Amino acid sequence: MPDLQIGRVIKPHGVKGEVVVDPSTDHVPERFAIGEALRAVQTGKERQLTVTGMRRHQNRLLVTFEEIRDRDEAESLRGARFMAAPLHDDSDDGYYDHELIGLRVLNVGSVDADTANRRAYEGEQPEPVDIGEVTGVSHGPAGATLEVAVDADADLPTAGSTILIPFKLAIVPIVDLDNEALVVTPPEGLLELA
């Protein structure tokens, strides 16, 4: 399994080499623990950095590294992505962002999960309509949101543009990694919002 992005440097903070990090992991204490060696990737270059301090600041982290001693060195990290191997938790039934990106999006209409399953897998009419592909996942206080590039030939007013779909069980009842697709049961009007 490929390494995952666990955070990204936004900007320097202060004059002593601290950086603002936008975390993209549910395991912040483990990933950014003091003494943890992080792999920073930036414009094709990689370097190892050792965490010497981490504190929360609003929805982000302020992190210091042994190798970064001042603001100029911290500025050189702007935009760097921290990559790490996945942590495996057998009790976790969630999905990593990279597993969702690239999945085809099948619309079965505004129906319940059982009807969605019958339409997607048992041939019940009307069959699902392939509307596009997941191109990104964003995370906010209300949960994850899928960024979907709607196919230019889709029969939707948003054809050729990007729409946002809340990644909630009521709207995305089926994620089928084996068939590289997910099924959506959007409320009326959701797919028309660009």
Curated annotation (Swiss-Prot):
The keyword Cytoplasm applies. Its main location: cytoplasm. Residues 92-190 form the PRC barrel domain. GO terms for cellular component: cytoplasm; ribosome. Coiled coil: none annotated. One of its GO terms (biological process) is rRNA processing. It is found in: Cytoplasm. One of its GO terms (molecular function) is ribosome binding. It holds the Pfam family RimM. InterPro entries: PRC_barrel-like_sf, PRC_RimM, RimM, RimM_N, RimM_N_sf, Transl_B-barrel_sf. It comes from the Bacteria. Keywords: Chaperone, Cytoplasm, Ribosome biogenesis, rRNA processing. The keyword Transcription does not apply. Gene3D superfamilies: PRC-barrel domain, RimM. Binds ribosomal protein uS19. Belongs to the RimM family. PANTHER family: RIBOSOME MATURATION FACTOR RIMM. NCBIfam families: 16S_RimM. An accessory protein needed during the final step in the assembly of 30S ribosomal subunit, possibly for assembly of the head region. Essential for efficient processing of 16S rRNA. May be needed both before and after RbfA during the maturation of 16S rRNA. It has affinity for free ribosomal 30S subunits but not for 70S ribosomes. The PRC barrel domain binds ribosomal protein uS19. This is Ribosome maturation factor RimM.
